[in-house]
């Protein structure tokens, strides 16, 4: 029998490797196989925390730029009005506590940029790059350390810098100390400003009072000038009224004196006594009669060789005699003055200059053919007045109806 030839057997081809991730490959048969559903799970992309999304939307909203907005450059955001921001927190979060909001910022790694305002920054929180929010991670607590150790664990920094607290309230202690110092400084400035304001108020009040006094004086001066312009003889009348008032202080209406002349009782008046009154002593030269009597060198006295010095009649009569007696005495003298130039300095009415108790010259009124003498002027008779005379003059003018309108207007 013939032998049968066998075809050579080729080795079985290796089975193709199963496809990774399924798709076009078939399912693995058998009990030990696994379907695509039980294969390795593809990791999902990282999600952004809702807190970061809400904060980003608040900062980017133009309607809230006066409360919170991006800082210059867009690398940080600023809370301009913390009170208004805290009031509007409940619209975006479940709370309205500004401190809790700051705590959450610290939890996500935000840091305060400016010490004097609420400005915060993070590398993944940039204007116009919202996709970077997924890079911001929330800090996680270590399972090996207890929460109390985490809150109290300080981190040593470079020499000269303060320790930074890490934990739930990390970084807030330093901020609280800064706020306390700022508050103390502001309180001191407030006290200084209040003191300065009180001082300024007192100065302004003093200036107002001085201005009111100046305005009153100006009104009085303007009223007096208006009266003088309307009535030019007002000054002459005022001077005559003053002279009459001063004479009435010494003479009664019946012509008698109210009090005696102290110079006659106490003797001659010395310069020391009259200098304190502001009066002036006028030397009087009596006439020299043609008699055989001897003239003693006693000033103001004429006597014989055997007689005692007596006061001059011209000095004794001004306050003791009436005006008419003075005129008679002057008329009876042939030569009343040794030098007639003194008499010719007056007008034609032959007025005699008299002196009052204070040795101040006065001009008594007299009649000349039924007419009064010429009015006095301020330039001719500007005499010093005592305080008592000024008070009596003011009282008289206030009771005089002629000057009532002048006082009222002034």
From Swiss-Prot:
Residues 179-229 are annotated as: Hydrophobic repeat HR-A/B. Exhibits temperature-dependent phosphorylation. Residues 20-33 have a biased composition (Gly residues). Residues 1-44 are annotated as: Disordered. One of its GO terms (biological process) is regulation of transcription by RNA polymerase II. A motif (Nuclear localization signal) lies at residues 256-260. One of its GO terms (cellular component) is nucleus. A motif (Nuclear export signal) lies at residues 279-290. GO terms for molecular function: DNA-binding transcription factor activity; sequence-specific DNA binding. Keywords: Coiled coil, Cytoplasm, DNA-binding, Nucleus, Phosphoprotein, Stress response, Transcription, Transcription regulation. Residues 171-246 form a coiled coil. InterPro entries: HSF_DNA-bd (IPR000232), WH-like_DNA-bd_sf (IPR036388), WH_DNA-bd_sf (IPR036390). Gene3D superfamilies: Winged helix-like DNA-binding domain superfamily/Winged helix DNA-binding domain. It comes from the Eukaryota. Transmembrane segments: none annotated. It is found in: Cytoplasm; Nucleus. Homotrimer. Belongs to the HSF family. Class A subfamily. The hydrophobic-rich region (HR-A/B) corresponds to the oligomerization domain. This is Heat stress transcription factor A-9.
